[in-house]
């Protein structure tokens, strides 16, 4: 479900997309940017919020592999997608709601990543 939602959204944003025939290298799709470069995307589908405020995904198996450039997070209940440049981390947390203690420092907001990143 998430892969189709991401493909549709990227086409709507005007990108060319390519889907691997075999899912063996941790890449769900490849996006051709406006400058002609290609970016490898891993898609994660999330069905519920952790602690009621944030979408969280584990990325442990991608750390230090140099296999992906962007993580696309599809939050199914709201039918929304975030495109986060992969920074070689073991997990990703994107806030959808304000936390109970109103913490904002070092918090990444889901809606800040609605457009696919253009790399230089």
Kindly label every feature range from the protein language model.
Residues 1-25, 30-120:
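Mixed-charge (Asp/Glu-Lys/Arg
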């Amino acid at each position: 479900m998430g892969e189709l939602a991401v493909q549709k959204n990227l086409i709507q944003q005007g990108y060319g997309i390519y889907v691997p025939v075999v899912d063996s290298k941790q890449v769900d799709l490849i996006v051709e940017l406006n400058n002609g470069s290609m970016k490898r995307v891993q898609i994660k589908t999330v069905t519920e919020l952790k602690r009621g405020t944030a979408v969280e995904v584990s990325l442990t198996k991608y750390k230090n592999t140099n296999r992906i450039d962007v993580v696309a997070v599809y939050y199914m209940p709201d039918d929304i997608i975030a495109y986060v440049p992969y920074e070689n981390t073991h997990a990703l947390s994107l806030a959808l709601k304000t936390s109970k203690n109103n913490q904002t420092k070092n918090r990444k907001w889901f809606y800040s990543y609605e457009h696919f990143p253009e790399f230089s």
